[in-house]
């Protein structure tokens, strides 16, 4: 009998929690028409001969304002660093040569404007689709022995994104989850290795306001 009561109590508690979660009031975020996200970012470089290793060394910051019930405009800034170890090899330039291993790094910092279309605003689950466009600074660097060679580049940046904001409480911050693809026109290289455009896919997980 005690076991039955214990199971019943747990079942009722779970039912009450689920009912409360799915019956949240319409006002489920901290501002009526504004939005902001702070995210950790993980990316996967595509067709990048300079640094092709995935990495979690990134952050994203964005925010904006809804001009209509569903459509918003805003601004963004994010950054990411990818690394790749290059085994020892000989590099020749004319009559000179250098034999060394290298540590390649690509630092990307895009920023600009964004737009998004959101569904189910004011509820607990708010999916959206968006597009970003702007400029990107990218630093390509190679460390070898005690030296470093680098190339600083600029390019045009564009990135479609899909995501969802989840607000499990009536008021206060929520959870932001997104997936994105990005392309930038940056060109450059060091130590006879470089890039002609930067492509990435990635995910973002963070806090939504």
List each language-model region with its residue ranges.
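Cleavable N-terminal export/targeting peptides
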Residues: 1-32
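Short, aromatic- and cysteine-enriched interfacial helices/patches
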Residues: 3, 7-12, 46, 146, ...
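Short glycine/proline- and aromatic-enriched beta-strand/turn motifs that initiate or cap beta-hairpins
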Residues: 26-73, 206-208
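Gram-negative (and chloroplast) outer-membrane scaffold detector with strong preference
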Residues: 33, 42-44, 62-145, 155-158, ...
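Outer-membrane beta-barrel translocator domains and adjoining extracellular loop/strand segments
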Residues: 48-55, 85-92, 139-148, 187-195
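Predominantly the C-terminal beta-signal and adjacent terminal strand-loop region
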Residues: 81-88, 158, 163-209
